[in-house]
Regions:
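Conserved SAM-binding motif I beta-strand of class I
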Residues: 45-50
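Conserved class I S-adenosyl-L-methionine
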Residues: 20-29
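Short SAM/SAH-binding signature in class I
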Residues: 87-95
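S-adenosyl-L-methionine
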Residues: 1-21, 35, 57-86
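Conserved SAM/SAH-binding beta-strand->alpha-helix loop
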Residues: 52-54
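Class I S-adenosyl-L-methionine
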Residues: 2-6, 81-82, 87, 99-179
């Protein structure tokens, strides 16, 4: 069977998903990420959510094309509003702005309370999101860079817990870590 090909941007998110995760893809669009993770055996099921019917239908189409509709749930909802806290422990929110990602997390405090792994890939407002995460008790464990064409993307690996205060430079560029 054919497998979905991930772009470098989505592959950087996929690399951070732990084996056996209960996974949600917020703003799934085509559902390439959860389909690839299922094909690789990294996860056993997924919740794919989107705010608009069109992208959610494309997601269903992708899952159907690869024979995975029985292993995925599709939710038409705003952010995490249609996902119950006990359904997932790993959440990807990629392809939207940092302010939108912060608003989604603010509306779902259970992501912090249940210590979910958050894989965040803001397309804009990265300094805003770093500041918001720090102020709301999350820690960025690491950041991965990926490149597609001339564009660089940053993926944040985020957990609940206090983060050392970021300097103004770190708010803009991220904290440099080894490994």
């Amino acid at each position: 069977m054919r497998t979905v090909e991930l772009t470098p941007r989505l592959r950087s998110v996929a690399e951070l998903v732990p084996r056996g995760a209960r996974f949600a893809d917020v703003g799934t669009d085509h559902a390439y990420l959860p389909v690839w993770l299922l094909q690789q055996g990294r996860i056993t099921g997924a919740v794919a959510s989107d705010l608009r019917p069109g992208p959610l239908e494309r997601a269903r189409g992708t899952a159907e094309k690869y024979g995975l509709t029985g292993r995925m749930d599709f939710r038409l909802c705003d952010g995490l509003s249609g996902i119950q806290p006990d359904e997932v422990n790993t959440i990807a929110i990629a392809g939207m702005g940092g302010e939108t990602i912060a608003a989604i997390l603010a509306a779902a405090p259970w992501t912090w309370e249940r210590e979910c792994l958050l894989l965040l890939q803001p397309m804009s407002a990265q300094p805003f999101l770093r500041r918001w995460l720090q102020a709301h008790g999350y820690t960025i464990r690491r950041e991965l860079l990926s490149r597609e064409g001339d564009t660089l993307y940053t993926t944040f690996e985020v957990y609940a817990g206090p983060m050392a205060k970021l300097t103004p430079a770190e708010l803009w560029a991220g904290r440099q870590t080894r490994g």
